[in-house]
């Protein structure tokens, strides 16, 4: 992709992820330039892509842009087993009148973003004037962070008998 962009003078958008971080990365107000030592192949490939994007911008002038997305959630796409899918799956359980078994530990906060907001962020970045960009590897973006109990409390306002347990 980057080599084709270099050859044809195209801009490249690469979605990255907070999965590019690791345990040593600061969890609060994560700096734009920070330590990235992920422990998963997913995270390693995201860091690799960020570094390659930076390299192609610096070496060849390829217009590379990326966003480090948090977990993306949607009311349209059914949960598919990802880490953040519990935040959608819990509503399916509530609507079906089922007890929800939460895969997370109590008090686990996760950063998430609504899919239309994620798309708008990507579009805004691609429409930005190139000379105004300070980074080429990836931009941190944030939207919301909550734990399972917060969602459960909100659901109980509408479905008082709703029950959630932890694995």
Predicted ranges, named:
Residues 41, 45:
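Active-site helix of classical SDR
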Residues 103-105, 111-167:
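C-terminal substrate-binding subdomain of Rossmann-fold SDR/epimerase-dehydratase oxidoreductases
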Residues 6, 57, 95, 126-130, ...:
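Protein kinase-like catalytic domain
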Residues 12-16, 20, 65-71, 111, ...:
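Structural signature of the Rossmann-like NAD(P)-dependent dehydrogenase/reductase core
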Residues 1-5, 12, 52-53, 121, ...:
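Hydrophobic positions on the long internal alpha-helix
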Residues 1-40:
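Conserved Rossmann-fold NAD(P)-dependent oxidoreductase catalytic core, especially the SDR/UDP-sugar
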Residues 54-109, 115-117:
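NAD(P)-dependent short-chain dehydrogenase/reductase
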Residues 48, 52, 56, 86, ...:
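Hydrophobic alpha-helix immediately C-terminal to the catalytic Tyr-X-X-X-Lys motif of short-chain
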């Amino acid at each position: 992709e980057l080599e084709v962009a270099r050859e044809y003078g195209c801009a490249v958008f690469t979605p990255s992820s907070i999965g590019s971080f690791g345990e040593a990365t600061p969890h609060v107000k994560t700096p734009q330039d920070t330590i990235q030592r992920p422990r998963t192949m997913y995270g390693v490939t995201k860091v690799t892509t960020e570094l390659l994007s930076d390299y192609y911008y610096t070496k060849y002038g390829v217009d590379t842009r990326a966003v480090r997305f948090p977990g993306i959630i949607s009311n349209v796409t059914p949960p598919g087993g990802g880490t953040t899918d519990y935040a959608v799956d819990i509503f399916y359980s509530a609507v079906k009148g089922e007890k929800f078994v939460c895969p997370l530990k109590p008090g686990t906060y996760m950063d998430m973003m609504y899919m239309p907001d994620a798309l708008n962020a990507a579009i805004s970045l691609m429409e930005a004037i190139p000379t105004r960009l300070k980074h080429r590897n990836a931009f941190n973006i944030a939207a919301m962070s909550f734990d399972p109990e917060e969602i459960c409390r909100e659901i109980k306002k509408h479905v008082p008998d709703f029950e959630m347990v932890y694995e």
